[in-house]
Amino acid sequence: MLTIFAISDSIAETAHQVTLAVAAQFKEKIKIRRVPYIKTIDDVDCIFPEIAKIERKIIISTIITVDVREYLTKKCYEKNIYIMNVLGPLIDSISSMLNTNPEYKPGAMRQIDEIYYKRIEAMEFAMQYDDSKDYGGLKNADVVLIGLSRTSKTPLSMYLANKGVKAINIPLMPEIGVPDEIYTIDKKKIFGLKIDAFQLIEIRKKRLDKFHRISSSIEYAGDERILEELEYSDRIMKRLGCKTIDITQRAIEDTALIILESIGYNKNTNIY
């Protein structure tokens, strides 16, 4: 039986997945052994006696660090063991095309996976706590958005979620008030979305026209009603002492950028 050693200087997930994909092309039974965290030349020396015991073997390596990768390759050549460096040649080719040196970061793929799953978690969070569905997420939120109806709270929450930021949004309505819990969280997390009265009237009227709502919803887009709501939202935001952002004629991306900078968000990957 053939044994394939999936060796890496991280958790060996990439090497393991590549090996599984290749092994699936054959009917014969193939044993796969994952060998993670081979970070030094000494680590290579430690695993070699065990590898040498196996009669039929191949090594699949995703080791990033050059000296460790080259040492492993040299040992394999000396022992007449077939080795495939999965990432090395590709890194070298891309480095040549870009005319720049790679960072050689072990576990970089795992970091990208973590960023991806953080985004998914943030999106689920945003949907769960959208528009006052549940205030239980306040203490776990990275950002709390407050504002009147039609101030882009939901799309802004989803945009932030795509950056891995957990955002909860709370609508401001004079008849309902805000949850008491909001006064217990760090005000630096809270962002009040303000808007010009004339633009809000226009947005709400278009909303009503879209759904052909007239009689029971006239107040929703009425001048007096909107001015009352704006005064109420101003009072709440002042009481909370939170940062306010005027979203009038402002793109969601611009509003999000202000928030991300305020909470110290760092873009930590160059993968898009």
Curated annotation (Swiss-Prot):
Family, similarity comment: Belongs to the pyruvate, phosphate/water dikinase regulatory protein family. PDRP subfamily.
Role of this protein: Bifunctional serine/threonine kinase and phosphorylase involved in the regulation of the pyruvate, phosphate dikinase (PPDK) by catalyzing its phosphorylation/dephosphorylation.
Lineage top rank: taxon: Bacteria
EC class of the enzyme, as a word: transferase
The UniProt record lists the keyword Transferase: yes
Annotated binding of ADP, by residue: G147, L148, S149, R150, T151, S152, K153, T154
Sections of the chain in a coiled coil: none
Name of the protein in question: Putative pyruvate, phosphate dikinase regulatory protein
EC number in record: 2.7.11.32, 2.7.4.27
Disulfide bonds: none
Family annotation (InterPro entries): Kinase-pyrophosphorylase, PPDK_reg
HAMAP family per the UniProt record, alphabetical: PDRP
Catalytic activity: N(tele)-phospho-L-histidyl/L-threonyl-[pyruvate, phosphate dikinase] + ADP = N(tele)-phospho-L-histidyl/O-phospho-L-threonyl-[pyruvate, phosphate dikinase] + AMP + H(+); N(tele)-phospho-L-histidyl/O-phospho-L-threonyl-[pyruvate, phosphate dikinase] + phosphate + H(+) = N(tele)-phospho-L-histidyl/L-threonyl-[pyruvate, phosphate dikinase] + diphosphate
Gene Ontology MF: a single term: ADP binding
Keywords: Kinase, Nucleotide-binding, Serine/threonine-protein kinase, Transferase
Organism: Clostridium botulinum (strain Alaska E43 / Type E3)
